[in-house]
Amino acid sequence: MKSSILHFHHITSLALRPEVAAGYKSASKKVGKMTETWLGEQVVCPACGRRLRHYEPNRPVADFLCPECRLDFELKSKKGPISTTVNDGAYSKMIERITSDTAPSFFFLQYDAEYMVRNLFVTPAHYFTPEIIEERAPLKPMAQRAGWVGCNILTKAIPASGRIYYVRDGQVRPTEEVCEQYHHTAFLSGRNLEQRGWLIDVMTCVERLRKPEFTLQEMYAFESHLAQLHPDNHNIRPKIRQQLQFLRDAGYLTFASRGCYKLTHS
């Protein structure tokens, strides 16, 4: 973990405060103000543990900035469970940002009818690839913004390792654990889009095995699945071995025995 982390701030309240949104009439704007205020007061950067700074309103694809790390964050909030797809802004702008060096990380927040935060997780920017951004149909000609193309974030495509919880089922997780989990997969940020795509796909296959130790033969069972995801690659088994080696070099896996791997965090 980065030595720059000197002191951890912990979440001390899960209550959203309606009074901070008293000047708003729109229900969505009220909720936006309440959740953004709560996040700014309670939540820290997962990379360094510092407080986040709020951007000016309506900035495309960014709501918060870490002054220390210079990382951008966007907040998506919802009453009730977070769905498998989350609406976002303009498709072209989203693709432009996630394929750039300043791609944002995303906070996904769920609150209940009493305005209490039930779940909050962050998905680091290095987990975002164009494959998990779905293009929506253009707005119809009679719409005010006719032809505008929005997008959805396919949260169902985000592996468990890319869902770093601060709050889960109303229980606050220690900030130290949040930062540790973030740094456990930070090696992805140094890879290009194609490399990240392969690594994330293989990591997702490992997660689907649902056990801390697994064999190379078990990973070969995903050969046809990975071939569908990467139709231009005709050497899937060697690619699986290569990705497992990358994950081992990054400290994500270790060798348990010949042909057998073990997750370093499970």
Where are these regions (language model features)?
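A short, conserved structural fragment
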Residues: 244, 248-258
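Long, low-complexity, charged/polar intrinsically disordered regions in eukaryotic proteins
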Residues: 123-200
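Short, cationic-aromatic polyanion-contact patches
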Residues: 258-266
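Short, positively charged loop/turn segments that connect secondary-structure elements
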Residues: 224-240
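Cysteine-rich micro-motifs
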Residues: 59-72
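Short, flexible, mixed-charge glycine/proline-rich loop motifs
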Residues: 32-42, 54-60
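Positively charged, polyanion-binding regions of nucleic-acid-associated proteins
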Residues: 194-213
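Short metal-binding segments enriched for Cys and/or His
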Residues: 71-103
